[in-house]
Amino acid sequence: MSLKNLPSESMPREKLLQRGPQSLSDAELLAIFLRTGTQGMNVIELADFLLRDFGSLRKLFSADEQSFCRHKGLGQAKYVQLQAVLEMTQRYLAETLQRGDALTSPQHTKLYLSSMLRDRHREAFYVLFLDNQNRVIKDEVMFEGTIDAASVYPREVVKRALHYNAAALILAHNHPSGVAEPSQADRRITRRLSDALGLVDIRVLDHFVVGDGEVVSFAERGWI
């Protein structure tokens, strides 16, 4: 059963228009994306089944093509559509950061870094290079693998920061375990980078650690 054939009181599109998207459940939002159900399940029932099967909306959205398309009611076209939506979301967050002050929109910064890092299966060390107005000049993954003192090279970070004529940096990396709590090694790396960058008058404004559903800020902890 499609959305248009649902009883009016059960139609998530109408609910969204009347009450706003925040009033919808995860299943209702997913139903709008799916548009139609399958034999034996209307679209709301299908959405609810998929959320239970994957475990969460985030796990559904981060599924690879094979895992996504093995479900009845989903296919390559839906997978492509979903990837386009996710990419547009990342670009929106990136544009918001690039046009504004990264420090005055910390929630956008967290959302953007989370979207870039949380679903990686390997650790990745990410850097936002900022100008003297704290606007993002460039952002990129600098190191991948096990993020420790042996794999993060302060000299390379300094070199890259000078290349972009950056005045400040925001650092970030993910914990594939899902636990965002920073380790002692994370704190040591941050101090080494801050010291090295300080020699060329470049500040480290924050270091975010991205986990599963949580992002920890060193600045908020008073560690920077």
Curated annotation (Swiss-Prot):
Residues passing through the membrane, by range: none
Motif (JAMM motif): 173-186
Alphabetically ordered keywords of this record: Hydrolase, Metal-binding, Metalloprotease, Protease, Zinc
Residues annotated for Zn(2+) binding in this entry: H173, H175, D186
Ranges for domain MPN: 102-224
Protein's UniProt keywords contain Acetylation: no
NCBIfam families: PRK00024.1, radc
Organism domain of life: Bacteria
Gene Ontology terms for molecular function: metal ion binding; metallopeptidase activity
Signal peptide: none
Residue ranges of the region described as Disordered: 1-20
GO biological process, one term: proteolysis
SUPFAM superfamilies found in the cross-reference section: JAB1/MPN domain, RuvA domain 2-like
Pfam families given in the database record: RadC, UPF0758_N
InterPro entries documented for this protein: MPN, RadC_JAB, RuvA_2-like, UPF0758, UPF0758_CS, UPF0758_N
Keyword match GTP-binding: no
Family per record: Belongs to the UPF0758 family.
Protein name: UPF0758 protein VV0285
